[in-house]
Amino acid sequence: VTAVHNIKSNKGSRTAGVDKIKMDKYLQMPKDELILLIQSSFRNYRPKPARREYIEKSNGKKRPLGIPTVLDRIIQECVRIIIEPICEARFYPQSYGFRPYRAQKHAIRGIINVINAGCKSPDQPVWAIEGDIKGCFDNINHRLLLQKLWRIGIHDKRVLKIISQMLKAGYMENDLFHATELGTPQGGILSPLLSNVYLNDFDWYVGRMYMEPHRQCKHKGNDTRRLKWAGVTPKYNYRYADDW
């Protein structure tokens, strides 16, 4: 029931998938009947292909969007509710995209704080390396993703099977079916969480390259000042979605 209400509150909740069934149908169903339908779908999950649409980006290019059926969105939201707390407990602290109670402003504030703590004077330059993972959602390896889910703590094979089937559901474009061997559909409920799972090892690897071997103080600001006066330049990793 929570999953249904979460989907209902989403901006695109009234958009139908390839089956052309809208959210209103499920909202009009008796509660017990809807719960039985969701339970049955869990036991015999066969996701339908996503409906491919394109939305314009600010640079004039178009970004592909995969719109699952409403029932598939409800199933994905159920899975998200189950696995998100497990994943959150293992995520890198300075990862800010697609996470509860985190936003761009928190990433910006963290970056400003380490800059202010690390500068001897207002005129001291601070270097930043910006990276953008090209085609991040479209190039996620399904096998590696499932392995990372297992390592992060998702050990229920039924849940892993549902995620695997969702990844391989494909999409429909101009009445033609296209298989998906790589990537997670942009527009899928689970895709943002799965992208964070996939990039979590990267976050920890880069973050530990500098801070972990030098960590002595409880507070990061104190470590920054100590290393600064020792002549060691502090380095930090901040990521928001596919930008770091």
Model segments located where?
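Short alpha-helical scaffolding segments that buttress acidic/His motifs in well-ordered protein cores
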Residues: 3-7, 78, 162-167
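Extended, charge-enriched "interface" segments that sit outside catalytic cores
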Residues: 23, 27, 41, 46-48, ...
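Conserved polymerase palm-domain catalytic core
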Residues: 42, 49, 93-94, 106-244
